[in-house]
Amino acid sequence: MNLARSGDAPQPRRWWSPWRIVGLVCVGLFLAGIGRFYDHRTGFTSLISIGDKLGDGKVPALKAVPHYVYEDSYGYDGAYYVQIALDPLLTGSELQTSVDNLPYRAKRILLSWTAWLLGGGQPFWIVH
């Protein structure tokens, strides 16, 4: 004989558990923090740290794409790796003059190839 009472039915789970709310707040804060770096003209390219002292030392494909440039700075490694990502086969002769210590940096090609693949080989999408 089944004497189950109506109050014994399983209760539906609440969507607003405290841990879920904390997780959603953390995701929201992370996205808001990353969103500060977005510019409608240059996208997220400020995260690459390309300096103006590179000047004419950029590969032509990078010069053709709008990107954020830090003034009075050489930039950081991202400035070189984005140029390698624009030509991951390293066939362009301009890479020799535009990338500092190319043999050393070419050994770390995974991120450059990943950017090239995700960008579909299109310079705008590779840089952004």
Predicted regions and their residues:
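Structural motif marking the loop-to-transmembrane transition
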Residues: 12-20, 102, 106, 110, ...
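Short hydrophobic/aromatic helix or loop-helix immediately within or flanking a transmembrane segment
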Residues: 75-93, 97-122
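A near-ubiquitous, low-amplitude feature marking generic local secondary-structure context
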Residues: 30, 64-68, 97
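Generic anion/oxyanion-binding catalytic loop in active/binding sites
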Residues: 36, 70, 103
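Start-transfer (signal-anchor) and selected internal transmembrane alpha helices
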Residues: 1-61
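Aromatic- and Gly/Pro-rich amphipathic surface segment
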Residues: 52-72, 76, 80
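Short, intrinsically disordered, charge-balanced linker/junction segments flanking boundaries
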Residues: 122-128
